[in-house]
């Protein structure tokens, strides 16, 4: 004996399945994320955006200058060099507990290449060459005086190609409590 699945039954069960899946997403706290603007919520984690990968390794405060020092690794898997202009490629913000911007800096930043294991500084500035991984230290003026409290959030944004695609970015949103060493 066989059962013929009618169009009406198909639509009825499809609708019930869609409602069940949507309800499960609401109950489990399913988070929707924009693939063109990934957000990472932990220090030491990275992601890719197209042919560019990024990893925020550490956030430190330079006690002598008051600057923030963000150690950041970038992988350029593209056929074109990746510009690494600190004043166009990076934005640093501190958000209060409600998510409103309390402090931001996207100008007067500086960047330096981290020396390799042999002690030599690689030639990865002002552009990261094709199919290369580079490690940088991004210096952010006045960060130490505005660093996030435990209930506030640090937002570090990397814009891989600001002139060509300023809307594509990788962002790290890290609670101040997770930055304490």
Model-predicted segments: where are they?
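The feature marks short-to-medium sequence segments in extracytoplasmic or secretory-pathway proteins
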Residues: 77-132
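N-terminal secretory signal peptides and thylakoid transit peptides that target proteins
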Residues: 1-18
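C-terminal motif of bacterial Sec signal peptides marking the signal peptidase cleavage site
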Residues: 28-29
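Surface-exposed edge beta-strand/loop patches
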Residues: 134, 139-181
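Short structured motifs
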Residues: 53-59, 117-125, 139-141
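Solvent-exposed, conformationally flexible loop/turn segments
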Residues: 43-46, 65, 116-117, 127-133, ...
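Low-complexity, acidic Ser/Thr/Pro/Gly-rich terminal tails and inter-domain linkers that flank the onset
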Residues: 35-63
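Short, well-ordered beta-strand segments enriched in hydrophobic/aromatic residues
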Residues: 68-76
């Amino acid at each position: 004996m066989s059962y013929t699945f009618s169009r009406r039954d198909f639509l009825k069960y499809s609708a019930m399945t869609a409602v069940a899946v949507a309800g499960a997403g609401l109950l489990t706290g399913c988070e929707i994320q924009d693939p063109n603007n990934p957000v990472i919520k932990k220090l030491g984690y990275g992601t890719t955006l197209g042919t560019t990968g990024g990893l925020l390794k550490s956030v430190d405060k330079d006690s002598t200058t008051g600057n923030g020092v963000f150690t950041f690794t970038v992988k350029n898997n593209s056929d074109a060099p990746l510009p690494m202009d600190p004043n166009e490629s990076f934005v640093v913000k501190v958000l209060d507990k409600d998510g409103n911007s309390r402090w931001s800096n996207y100008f007067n930043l500086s960047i330096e290449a981290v020396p390799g294991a042999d002690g030599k500084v690689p030639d990865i500035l002002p552009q990261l060459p094709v199919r290369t991984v580079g490690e940088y230290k991004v210096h952010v003026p006045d960060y130490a005086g505005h660093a996030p409290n435990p209930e506030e959030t640090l937002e570090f944004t990397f814009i891989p190609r600001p002139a060509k695609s300023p809307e594509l970015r990788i962002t790290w949103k890290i609670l101040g409590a997770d930055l304490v060493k």
